[in-house]
């Protein structure tokens, strides 16, 4: 049986992550408060950020920048702004 969490991003109950995907206290916070659906949304945004801003995950500054964006997206309700990207209209 899957576990459920009240997702901080989506503001609703959802299926929780199967295991802690990120290290440390932040990883624990994500595991306890973020649903699989919200995590999948973040992964999509993360890929766009890495590609568009040409981030190098070996660079500690780039990792810190990505972590800040992740916290803003998952916990503060801020969307990721990618310069020059226009989402497709519905």
From Swiss-Prot:
Extract one GO BP annotation from the record: cellular response to oxidative stress
Provide a GO CC annotation, any one: cytosol
- What would you give as a GO molecular function for this chain, any one? iron ion binding
Fetch the Pfam families from UniProt. Answer: Iron_traffic (PF04362)
Instruction: Identify the PANTHER family for this entry.
Output: FE(2+)-TRAFFICKING PROTEIN-RELATED
Main function? Could be a mediator in iron transactions between iron acquisition and iron-requiring processes, such as synthesis and/or repair of Fe-S clusters in biosynthetic enzymes.
Record-given protein name = Probable Fe(2+)-trafficking protein
Q: Whose protein is this, by species? A: Vibrio campbellii (strain ATCC BAA-1116)
